Amino acid sequence: ITLSGWDTNISNSENLIIRYMRFRPGAANVHTGGDSMDALWGRDNKTFMIDHCSFSWNTDETVSTYRGQDGTVQWCIVSESLTVSGHSKGRHGYGGIFGGDNVLFQNNLIANHTSRNPRIGGGCMGDPTKDGGSTATLQLSNNVLYNWGYNTCYGGGYAYTNFINNFLKPGQGTREQVRYQVIDMGEATKPGGFYVNGNYMDGNAEITADNAKGSKMSGVTEGANKTVVSETPYTAEGFDSATVTSAADCYEPVLAQAGATYPYRDAID
């Protein structure tokens, strides 16, 4: 099953499972359906799983799911956002916004996007800046990031994020100044925290051995809105028991198994 032509919105859903589907909106309706068409997006979701799906050819983000709780996005291909699609902001091909409390993003292939590879979007259900809002805890592990343009993973306000054991491989579209950037941590006006460890940077053994040498800090390090760099992983029931391999060992399985593989991959994947 392939959904095309329009974005797919799963916001405010609960007890949701999506498996073995393809989402490729394209740009044919960019001027009639709104120019911010994600292949799939949702916020304020509760108890959800997105597994073995393929997402591409969007005019805004490819996959965005944030400000929810108790979810997993795994074994998906998130690829080929449309950089020049007719979006009102011009060049606009992004990977996605990942977030939510007690949410795991694991074993995904995130490839060929200029930025938001992904962006970490913080907070739980509702607005984290208002009464009842809170800081989310999430994990990105064993993902393969390939051929980012001018930014890798960044953001992270109102979130405590484990960014661990991911495989990063720059490509022909990667700008030289971010070629070996593992992550850009924090937002200056929002509190948050990161645990970054075990990530493999293809072509740079020094950064593979010490991820701090490939990490940038865009948050502030003092005051109420500081971004904390943790020496130990953050914990949450949803991912504490997840099986996480080394970054080097996740590369081949993700390439072989990610995406809508049942009954077989299409020609795009």
What are these regions (language model features)?
Residues I1-L3, R24-P25, S56, E61, ...:
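Extracellular beta-strand scaffolds
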Residues I1-N102:
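Right-handed parallel beta-helix
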Residues S13, R91, H113, T161-F163, ...:
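Short, solvent-exposed loop/turn segments at the edges of secondary structure
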Residues R67-T72, I77-S81, H87-H92, I97-H113, ...:
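WD40 beta-propeller repeat blades
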Residues R119, C124, S134-D269:
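Extracellular beta-rich repeat passengers
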Residues P128-K130:
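Intrinsically disordered, low-complexity Ser/Thr- and acidic-rich flexible linkers and loops
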